[in-house]
């Protein structure tokens, strides 16, 4: 997995370098500090810094939904975005129905497949998603892909973020 991530980071760096006319700074949406998106963005920045042909400024954001919004508003030049979030934003679907379709961006490379896990304490009385009703649940930072995916999962079970604490 680490070799694949390193290869994808190198590929993205090459692609970003080919987009720059030199001298300009690429604003790169990196999500929250400490996460894999932030680590990947900073690795891309390090490779570009070592090469010296491209200046990348990583921007800490809430995550995928914020990144796609900031790309469409031209605040970011590049970002890491979950593919399902990019799809929904482009088509104005699911969590983007109210805001409508967002555009002004395109996919460059797939980095990795993401899984969503629901994890509880071993001694918990939670055995299914239905058991989350009335419980304290972390659904992720606002405008993150985690938040949007959590809301989709809860909705599929007839729950919403107001039904959990």
Language-model segments: residues:
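Short helix-initiation/N-cap motifs at beta->coil->alpha
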Residues: 34, 58-69, 160-165
């Amino acid at each position: 997995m680490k070799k694949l991530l390193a290869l994808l980071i190198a590929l993205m760096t090459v692609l970003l370098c080919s987009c720059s006319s030199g001298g300009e700074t690429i604003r790169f949406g990196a999500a929250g500090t400490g996460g894999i998106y932030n680590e990947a963005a900073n690795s891309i920045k390090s490779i570009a810094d070592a090469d010296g042909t491209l200046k990348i400024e990583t921007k800490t954001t809430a995550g995928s939904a914020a990144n796609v919004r900031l790309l469409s508003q031209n605040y970011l030049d590049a970002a890491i975005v979950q593919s399902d979030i990019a799809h929904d934003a482009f088509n104005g679907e699911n969590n983007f129905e109210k805001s409508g379709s967002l555009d002004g961006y395109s996919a460059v490379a797939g980095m990795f497949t993401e899984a969503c896990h629901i994890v509880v304490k071993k001694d918990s009385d939670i055995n299914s998603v239905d058991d989350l009703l009335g419980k304290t649940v972390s659904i992720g930072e606002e405008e993150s892909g985690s938040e949007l995916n959590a809301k989709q999962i809860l909705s599929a079970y007839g729950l919403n973020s107001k039904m959990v604490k």
